[in-house]
Amino acid sequence: MAQKTWMYSVLEAVQYEMRQRKDMVWLFELTPPVASNPGKPVINLEKEFGRTRVNNTGIDELWMAAATLGSALAGVTAVTYIPYQGNCMPFQLLQNHAGKLRSMTGGKASMPATFILEMTGQTPGFAGQHSDYEIDTYYSHIPGLKTVVPSTPYDAKGMIVSAIRDPNPVVFLYPAGLRDLSEDVPDEQYEVPLDKAAVRTEGSDLTIVGSGPSMPEVMKAAEALKQQGMNVEAIDLRSLKPIDTETLVNSVQKTKRLLTVDQSYYTLCPGAEVIARVAENVDGARFKRIAFPDAPPPASPEMFLWMRPNADHVIAAAQKLVG
């Protein structure tokens, strides 16, 4: 076991699966599947497996999604890496085909397709047209499509393994802001379930739920609140669809207070669904959500950081909810 970054952990898992599955393919544009890590060998999928299996398509997200979907329908395990989530050209394929064909064929069509979409938004100074990309709930609205967003290198490796081995299509959201995050990750393959949330800290005063890019700020806030004497139960959704309702309900039944934190937009953010599900199952609980405002991100880095939820925002909301 060694300290590994988010993307190194993912490519290490993909490399192993491609060695086991001789027809598995990886499709990409712009960003070659190469990763290095201190004390570990460089991973270069294109060099190891050749261009027949690791294909640089050029800048054409629709073609990438279509080729991935077609390969999966032909029985080939396929993964594509789309480096800008805001490029929504593949959306109609995900909406009208990827999520439905397995059901439309009575379950006969296997769909081992994984779509890695990089969440490149919420970056100070990129301005509205290049930062408007924390649109995670777009994909969780699509029936038949699983949507996951790991927040740690350990979960990223385990969940990409589960996604590749799943016969259903999976959207695998990659929070680009976490690219430099590293932690101990096993060298061997392992699976992290695609339908289970993770309880990061246990507590009895307040439940805080986040996912993907919001989790570092959630954990900072949870630690600060602990120093103030507040016992926080911090939950990482990991999966946006299916949502682990049981873990959420069990926590809020104990704390009776729920705060959700999202880097995506306030209206219809993942936290809205979390609150709705808990409210249907827990009586007498109090709720609050914080998220990025429903406004285009400004070009000013200072204003952008002021708008984006951070640990201070989480702490203030938690104090108000508990107090």
Name every feature range the model reports, one short phrase each.
Residues 1-169, 173, 178, 306, ...:
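Thiamine diphosphate
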